[in-house]
A protein has these predicted regions:
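Membrane-proximal helix-turn-helix segments that form the acceptor-binding/catalytic region
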Residues: 58-61, 108-127
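A short, well-ordered alpha-helix in the C-terminal region of glycosyltransferases
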Residues: 269, 276, 283-298, 304-310
């Protein structure tokens, strides 16, 4: 089977691009022919997605191949997907795209995207999302059904993350240096935390995971989210998590069971919970053990591979 993946990027600490890359790796392992389309873009904030879609569409029009499946990752990739010949078209999203645009740009821009979003979704034969909350929100917003397809955790990648010592009172932030991720909130309260914060915004994955494993906890202060892969990674590394109660975070972080949930944009509550957990070794151990069991039971390739192969084969 010949499959084409289209994504704005395939690298980074998290997000939909690395998700696409991990799926491509696994599919290749089991015999699928997966091609990654690489498209240039203009590295300016308001032009990245627009230039990606434009340059990609031009590239797509010149591609004379016919694929069994074209899989577009994120809404801007759909413009390219539309121009590629294939027997089946799949579009996957992390989060509600128009909502993300409004937070990062303006209500006017978001309004334009919202007016076209439903039509763009119609270009795909199958829609998927990694979050039940996004699945529900799109159902209410557009009436369209998204197949719930979680992003797996590849446990074999962690075999090289060994012999890492804990740094007492160290807290990790892993994610983009971007407004929707709430990094500004964590920076605002950093001086009130009874420990140090390591900000991992642009490091190689291996180095990021070593810092994460050496930390007492991971803090996810996002304003909006789908399902952060880094929470799954922290669970597997037995690093406790404090996350905001937004998007898909509660699908992973069960309050006072697999971690701690706090309201979004509540710096006082966030710093209180961080300091309380730093002082409570037993709670950290319990959350870490529960989370490790949860992630192995629900998000390994052993559990999810068949869902992915069914997506392409059906």
């Amino acid at each position: 089977m010949n499959i084409l993946f289209i994504s704005p990027t395939y690298s980074g600490a998290g997000g939909i691009g690395p998700h696409a890359f991990r799926v491509a790796e696994k599919l290749r392992e089991i015999g699928y022919n997966v091609e990654l389309m690489h498209v240039p873009h203009i590295p300016i904030k308001n032009l990245k997605n627009l230039s990606f879609s434009l340059f990609g569409t031009i590239k797509g029009l010149s591609n004379k191949k016919t694929y069994d499946v074209v899989h577009a990752w994120n809404l801007p990739s759909a413009f390219i997907m539309k121009r590629i010949k294939s027997k089946k078209k799949i579009l996957s999203v992390h989060g509600v795209y128009s909502k993300q645009v409004e937070m990062l740009h303006s209500k006017i821009t978001s309004g334009i995207v919202t007016s076209q979003e439903s039509q763009i979704l119609d270009w795909a034969d199958v829609l998927t999302t990694d979050s039940k909350s996004v699945q529900l929100e799109y159902k209410k917003k557009t009436g369209k059904y998204f197949e719930y397809l979680p992003a797996p955790l590849d446990k074999t990648k962690f075999e090289k993350i060994v012999n890492v010592e804990k740094n007492p009172k160290q807290i990790a932030y892993v994610g983009r240096d971007s407004f929707e991720k709430g990094i500004d909130i964590l920076r605002k309260i950093e001086s009130q935390i009874n420990g140090s914060v390591k900000f991992c915004t642009d490091l190689p994955w291996d180095e990021t995971m070593k810092i994460l494993k050496s930390s007492e906890m991971l803090v996810v202060p996002s304003r909006t989210e789908s399902i952060p892969q880094v929470i799954k990674e922290a669970f597997y590394l037995k690093v406790p998590v404090i996350a905001t109660n937004v998007g898909g975070n509660p699908e992973l972080v069960v309050h006072q069971e697999t971690g701690i949930l706090v309201p979004s944009e509540d710096p006082e509550k966030l710093v209180t919970e961080i300091n309380n957990l730093l002082d409570n070794e037993e709670a950290r151990r319990n959350y870490a053990n529960n989370a490790f069991e949860f992630i192995n039971k629900n998000f390994s390739w052993d559990v999810l591979l068949e869902k992915y192969t069914n997506l392409y084969e059906s």
